Amino acid sequence: GMGLSFKKRIKRLQMKEVAGRFKVVTGLKVSDLIDRLKRPKSANFVVIDSVQYLDVRSFDRLKKELFDRFPRKSFVLVSQVYKGRPKGKMADDIRFDCGVKIHTQGFRAYCQGRYADDAEAYFTIWEEGAAKYYLTE
């Protein structure tokens, strides 16, 4: 199920305003996700948090079963990090294949990849948290 921090974030971001257009589904296998995405009016954006919890371990298989099968859908893949790099071979393979990579640190998001004009540019996710993080860094 959803963790407490996620539930608090949904409340803080007033996600009830988009009820019916935003859905959280947990514990799905990739085959279940495929079944959901085959349905009419299924989600156009899918967030997978995190790739380490998928029941598929091969990037080639994930690409074939999800990305190639649903080319009009957008997938946002979240990865755990170990020593500044995506954790595990599949996460590393995803990193090299994807067009846009977003690295987060200290409540700031940095775009890394083909579309980044300025490597130092960032988006502040949470002002108060970022101020505390960078003040004490």
Regions found by a protein language model. Give the residues of each.
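Phosphate-binding/switch region of NTP-binding enzymes
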Residues: D68-E137
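Conserved P-loop
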Residues: G1-D32
